[in-house]
Amino acid sequence: MRVMGVDPGLTRCGLSVIESGKGRQVIALDVDVVRTPAGHPLAHRLLAISDAVDHWLDTHRPDVIAIERVFSNQNANTAMGTAQAGGVIALAAARRDIDVHFHTPSEVKAAVTGNGRADKAQVTEMVTRILALQQKPTPADAADALALAICHCWRAPMLGRMAAAEEMAAEQRRKYQATLKAKAKAAQMSRSTR
């Protein structure tokens, strides 16, 4: 499975592509950070991100995109810009019929380091080890994009099993409700014929 990991942001947007192998084997194919100047109009910044993502999607043809879920209890403007960048990326994926999955920062940290409260240095160190990179990916947005892709590769089988189980439970619920409805209707008809 080829996964594009995205650490969305207006000033720096981390992009990565990794390929999963057997078990937990993952191979880094590419990583970069798209930068947009803070002083430029929002629409132009989003367009620059969109153009870069379009190029990456056309070049790397990922099977799925993993985007960091926006979370911020500090700066609403930062959270809004991050969400807007993530939306541009999700839209580009939807136009190509590529699945998009969102992962929280704590899910990513837990998947990569075993600790959902790991700091950026710990995440970067583990990403470097997991992917057997010669040097640490910089800036942190690049490491975060790789961590998102790794997280998705490792969580995807579980997510697939959970989705299948939820679908099976929903189907059983529908059948059970149909049976109850049929029994109620039969009981009502039986009473009306007496």
Swiss-Prot record:
Annotated positions binding Mg(2+) 2: E68
Taxonomic path: Bacteria, Bacillati, Actinomycetota, Actinomycetes, Mycobacteriales
Gene name tied to this protein: ruvC
Gene Ontology molecular function terms on file: crossover junction DNA endonuclease activity; DNA binding; magnesium ion binding
Compartments where found: Cytoplasm
Any coiled-coil regions, as ranges: none
Cofactor(s) of this protein: Mg(2+)
Primary location class: cytoplasm
Biological processes per GO annotation: DNA recombination; DNA repair
Record Gene3D superfamilies: Ribonuclease H-like superfamily/Ribonuclease H
Keyword Zinc: no
Protein name: Crossover junction endodeoxyribonuclease RuvC
Organism (species): Mycolicibacterium vanbaalenii (strain DSM 7251 / JCM 13017 / BCRC 16820 / KCTC 9966 / NRRL B-24157 / PYR-1) (Mycobacterium vanbaalenii)
